[in-house]
Amino acid sequence: MIKIENLTKSYRTPTGRHYVFKDLNIEIPSGKSVAFIGRNGAGKSTLLRMIGGIDRPDSGKIITNKTISWPVGLAGGFQGSLTGRENVKFVARLYAKQEELKEKIEFVEEFAELGKYFDMPIKTYSSGMRSRLGFGLSMAFKFDYYIVDEVTAVGDARFKEKCAQLFKERHKESSFLMVSHSLNSLKEFCDVAIVFKNSYIIGYYENVQSGIDEYKMYQDLDIE
């Protein structure tokens, strides 16, 4: 379970402070993959980043005894002056036991298919190469929850299929916290839904289709 208590997150803007969330309270159940549904700017990705520990709230708590990934495929955190291998080794030291380091590095090297570039500085990589390394690194470690923000596969058609197969394998063993513009992907991978509107959560739904229906309804109301 992930328990969110009195969570507040805001940003300074030229016109004053903008609140993404204010005193948010919600529980995410164990063993359930959750679809986060809402318009752009509703706070879905911000909440995922805070759950994953790469952004901090102004106040409040996120309480869990589960392991949670960083956003799958995140490539922005690599150190450009280090090689792909060195970046992977650095992360592996944080998330794996000493005796597992070689295995994790070999997994990413084989999966990302970067050849000689795996031992070259990240700053020489194309965006696609960074994405392949980021996806492989995300999948190298087992988590109770994977954070999936609009990314399920990268690269050419063959590599995308390879990513999709591994993605499905991880889904058999773990839960996803997922944001996607593809409602079909949300229905395929998620069990329940949380629907966002502006800076608050409308509700928690025991099946994804109910959440999608609610989302479509308030969209229609806003248009009218």
From Swiss-Prot:
Domain of life: Bacteria
Gene3D superfamilies per record: P-loop containing nucleotide triphosphate hydrolases
GO cellular component: plasma membrane
One GO MF term: ABC-type transporter activity
Chain ranges of the ABC transporter domain: 2-223
Keyword Transport tagged: yes
Keyword presence, Electron transport: no
Keywords of the record: ATP-binding, Cell inner membrane, Cell membrane, Membrane, Nucleotide-binding, Transport
A Pfam entry, by short name: ABC_tran
Binding, ATP: G38, R39, N40, G41, A42, G43, K44, S45
Subcellular location: Cell inner membrane
Entry membrane topology: Peripheral membrane protein
PANTHER family, alphabetized: TEICHOIC ACIDS EXPORT ATP-BINDING PROTEIN TAGH (PTHR46743:SF2)
Family assignment from sequence similarity: Belongs to the ABC transporter superfamily.
Function: Putative ATP-binding protein, and an energy coupling component for the transport of polysialic acid across the cytoplasmic membrane.
Protein known as: Polysialic acid transport ATP-binding protein KpsT
The organism of origin for this protein: Escherichia coli
